[in-house]
Amino acid sequence: MAPLFTGFRFGFGRGAAAETGGAVNATGGTKTTYGSRTIHTFTTVGDATFTLENGNLPAVQIMVVAGGGSGGSRHGGAGGGGGMTYVAEPNGAINAGTYKVRVGAGGTATYAGTHATKGDWSFFGPTGTADWPTHVMAEGGGSGGCYSSNGGWSAGANGGGASGESSYPNPQQAPNSPAPTAFGTSVSKSGADGGGGDKWGTCPDCRLGGGGGGQAGNGGPANPGPATGGAGFQYQIAGDPNNNYYYGGGGGGGAWGQSGGVANGGHNPFSAGAAGIGGGGGGGSSQISPGGGKFGNGGASARNSGLDGSQGANSSGGDGGANTGGGGGGNGQSNYVSWPGPTNKGGAGGPGIVVIAYPTP
């Protein structure tokens, strides 16, 4: 469940003073308008500033989405969707000053047998050290498990899926995110769990990775598979029907196998998991056509859809969509006779986004 904040009083007293006289003016990010509201959208990974001069902004709406985790490769679990924090309070306000904005990167795509990485934090707040309760913050998504790692490799706002060749095929459990209680009554829940993997001998011989957790749903387990990613959470900016997307979808779990099956010296064919809506990347399948399972589709209904996984000896998990916080897709393995292959990777996590909207002064 994504965070819902009520009774929020947004008055950051620690922003650097910027009043110089004249009309109220805010700068930073890409500045657009919709109806009677002004919107600042920050999409570039890294640090930026939001500066407000000559007064305060009432009825502020803020959305912060962190980077998604990357998917594992070689029996890979999928990356979890990035965390999301939003603030929508008619009585909230931002005081004049300069504030720091950070857009978190998605987890890095890694090769077969190399541990996937967690997504980075995103935040908005004063220019000092970012922390609760002075900042609005969202934690990056957890990374997916790979061969020999237990569960998802790094915990995050939403859990990464477990590996399909793990001694502990249970999913990560999503931690609770702290809430900015200094600003008023708040309700916060960070997200969802990654799906469990299905290791050798239990399917039999599936070795499927679990789906990544999304902001609005758990990642699917590998058994019964395919391991789909959890759904992201839908959030509308400034009442704009064209700015109403899902964010933080989990990636789809990877699959391993060969079309010949165990009787012919290969591995049973199974399909990789589709990603959750909200920009997750689809799972990759190392199975060879014809007769094998297929790759998983990327998650749509997002600012930028997640990419599909790919299939075959050079398979990879799909990347999470740009500025969605979608988790990367897990990948199966390169050709089962010779691994790891030079191009087999889990999907990268999608970068996050920060959006600020308010009534046009």
Model region roles, listed by residue range:
Residues A2-P361:
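Low-complexity, glycine/proline-biased repetitive segments and flexible coils/loops
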